[in-house]
Amino acid sequence: MVAEKPGQTVLLVDDNAQNLELLEIYMEDLPEVRVVTATNGLEAMSKVVQDAPDLVLLDIMMPKMSGFEVCKRIKADPKTRDITVVMVTALNEPSDVERAAECGTDDYISKPIERKALVNLVRNLLATKTKG
């Protein structure tokens, strides 16, 4: 198993407090990873600039700016385009997955989320970033 790079940061973005808390609890399985949170799309963009996360777990349906728009902006900016973005959403229609792909998302997970699967995905994506 490849250890995560010390100091790697994961940004969790969800407007639902319970969902955000659940994601934070899941990330406790990765104690070496720094976790920051945002509750809407505008706050997420601010945190992307401020905290330079290695990975963003991003809800789609949020106030102020959708996850689709956040992802587009992250991937369009040369300073942030290498940030890994994973959509974590209740939307699971093929058209939603396709739209997320068009925005540049690196992966897509439908809620409800299984803890071990999410932790393993985050661990693997962060390990891949250390090799690149």
Name each model-derived stretch.
Residues M62:
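Receiver (REC) domain active-site loop signature in two-component systems and cognate sites
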Residues T37-L55:
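Acidic, metal-coordinating helix/loop segments flanking the phosphotransfer/catalytic sites
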